[in-house]
Curated annotation (Swiss-Prot):
Catalyzes the transfer of the diacylglyceryl group from phosphatidylglycerol to the sulfhydryl group of the N-terminal cysteine of a prolipoprotein, the first step in the formation of mature lipoproteins. A 1,2-diacyl-sn-glycero-3-phospho-(1'-sn-glycerol) binds at R154. InterPro entries: Lgt (IPR001640). GO terms for biological process: lipoprotein biosynthetic process. The chain crosses the membrane at residues 18-38, 58-78, 106-126, 133-153, 195-215, 221-241, 268-288. Pathway: Protein modification; lipoprotein biosynthesis (diacylglyceryl transfer). This is Phosphatidylglycerol--prolipoprotein diacylglyceryl transferase.
Amino acid sequence: MDAFIATFTSPGPELFQLGPFALRWYGLLIAIAVLIGLNLSSSLARKRGLEQGLISDLLPILVLTAVVGARIYYVAFEWRNYSGDNFWSSINIFGLAIPIPSAMEIWGGGIAIHGALLSGTLAVLIFCRWRRQAFWDVLDVLVPSIALGQAIGRWGNFFNNEAFGVPIKGDLAWKLFIPFVNRPLNYANNEFFHPTFLYESIWNLLVFTLLIVLFQRSNKGLLKLPAGALSCIYLITYSLGRVWIEALRTDPLCLGALPPSCEGGLRIAQLMSLAMMAVGGFGLWWLYGRKRKLPDPGRPKSFA
């Protein structure tokens, strides 16, 4: 009997095509995640007593900034694939080929969540200073939606046949089939790989569940959760999972080396995750060890 009980095979990146326009699964999943996140974070914001309509005002800015930041971050570390002869590409609109920089072809894949987190956090900070809102309170109602959005968005990697793990060795109860054209050259003869998209999706669902449980207990007065604590917990828990999952991937962003092994170099996502864990750990120590509030960059006077 076949030892495998679950085989994942992508139907392809496109849901359907209408003329020159195609609806991609990745885009649809991101849209779904944004809508769910809007409703969830708006509900949490009401429970936190934040200004009505704050999240709906912030969301368009946050999404745009996060997507642009995710793309810039990815292109910066993969510049060899977007420079020189690869700099220009084209987009076909009603039979007319329009030249564009290849770095703008975000629909072809190539975004990095750490870039989205960095640029998104900056957007929240600027927004809070503009609206004179408490930065940590706003961030705390966003992080559960971010974790859930990551869980949903990871399935976009499945449809795109990207961000998969190393070939499966031995018997496992699951496997991911990758078409020949999407396999790294050194794994061209391997058909089945670790479904790292699934690992991270499940991990992010667990992080989301933890954050919601903590938020609800805090809201009921059963747990002391100072402003910023939930954000710090997200940084630690998400990064814990990302560190070990990243070690399995065949397409990591590398520093001083090339994928899939990054031999002789470093995996950027692991470095960023370790840094996020350190920041989150320091934040919790500040809140619970020193029993002090986190300085609020959204309200400059709080530094006085």
